[in-house]
Amino acid sequence: MKRIESATAGQAGRLFDIMVRATELGCAAFYPPEVISIWHKGRSVEGMAGVIAQGGVYVLIDEQAVRGFVHFKDSEIVGLFVHPDDQRKGYGTELFRFAVGKMPVRPILIKATLNAIPFYAKLGCRKVRTESVRRHEHDIYVVRMKLS
């Protein structure tokens, strides 16, 4: 049975693995390998546990396994990741709709990787602008999207 619930510190390793695997595989056609490795530089399971402790991180569990997670704060989706083995099963859509339902303020903002644009567009989000995020002296291009 599927359910969405608050993430726990004990799930930090699984969430970190999902994030790394999803970005390595999902972003490979859109970003060079060195950019993807920079993205992960300095991130850790301990860091993920710290994010979970701050709240706003929810996991989707199906068949007793974490399949993906969403992290949101105020009216912004900070991250939404589904394990590559579990993509195209509707988990990302469920996590997105759950997060939107929890956010009291509109518009909702999303900072999306280039590969995620079609996913968010399908859910009614529109592109606002392309921007760069500076990480370890490199610019990583992402798209700011909005759901009104």
Locations of regions flagged by a protein language model:
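A short beta-loop-alpha structural element at the N-terminal edge
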Residues: 2-17
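Conserved GNAT-fold acetyl-CoA-binding loop/helix
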Residues: 20-46
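Conserved beta-hairpin
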Residues: 55-68
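A conserved beta-strand-loop-helix scaffold within acyl/acetyltransferase catalytic domains
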Residues: 70-75
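A short, internal acetyl-CoA/4′-phosphopantetheine-binding micro-motif in the GNAT/acyltransferase core
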Residues: 77-87
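Conserved acetyl-CoA-binding loop of GNAT-fold acetyltransferases
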Residues: 121-131
